[in-house]
Swiss-Prot record:
Originating organism: Citrifermentans bemidjiense (strain ATCC BAA-1014 / DSM 16622 / JCM 12645 / Bem)
Gene Ontology molecular function, alphabetical: structural constituent of ribosome
Keywords noted in UniProt: Ribonucleoprotein, Ribosomal protein
BP term (GO), one: translation
InterPro entries named in the record: Ribosomal_protein_uL29 (IPR050063), Ribosomal_uL29 (IPR001854), Ribosomal_uL29_CS (IPR018254), Ribosomal_uL29_sf (IPR036049)
Protein name: Large ribosomal subunit protein uL29
Protein family per UniProt: Belongs to the universal ribosomal protein uL29 family.
Domain of life of the source: Bacteria
GO terms under cellular component: cytosolic large ribosomal subunit
One Pfam family recorded for the sequence: Ribosomal_L29
Amino acid sequence: MKANELKNATAAELEAKGTELTKELFNVKFQLHTGRLENTSKVSNLRKDIARVKTILREKRG
């Protein structure tokens, strides 16, 4: 996910995207702990995407 794509999104879209990514992170962590996750870098990528969304959302609000 590119930061440029996020900057063009509305605040409501960013909140929805953040919620979606948080749910996906929960599922990926669950797979990691049960031993079913093959691509472990997905956890860190999701965390970075969530941080990007939160940062841009904070910029729009502030």
